[in-house]
Amino acid sequence: MLIAGVRSWWSFVLAANAGGRVSGDLLDAVWHNCGLLADGSIARFDHELSWAADIEPEVLLIRSAFQWHVRYSSAKLPHLMASRGIGTIRAIARRIGVDITQSHIRQFIEIETLLQSGIGYSSPERVRSAVRAALYVPHLPALKRLGDSLRTNFGRASRLMRRLAGKS
């Protein structure tokens, strides 16, 4: 079931692909921020974050799978708790026929580091370490803390965006 939804989402991403890259406006179009409509199209319902530069579609796939892994690896699901984030990401990518390279992973780490340190109160070094830990260390309580931190930072960003838009 998850993979079928991911395949539909990936088709949506590839349709936006221009010259091997997608708009940085799609940065927050991770699969749990999108919905599959009855006609088979994808609707984005949460897109408060964006990136100034275009990104490779594979980096967006890594970001989606990373956020999914962080969200559910602390849900006491044995197969996720025993895996490293990078293992989950690579397994999902393989299932939909996408090759993830070290270059894609490095780009993801850099984008996620700058994004999270920009909307949060942690230094880039701390965020980079937390992202790497979530990618390469099997389930630790640190993953839950990272997930909580990401949700808190996104909440702060949402409140800030609403306040700037005058919608307090």
Sequence positions of predicted segments:
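Alpha-helix boundary/N-cap detector
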Residues: 4, 80, 84-87, 141, ...
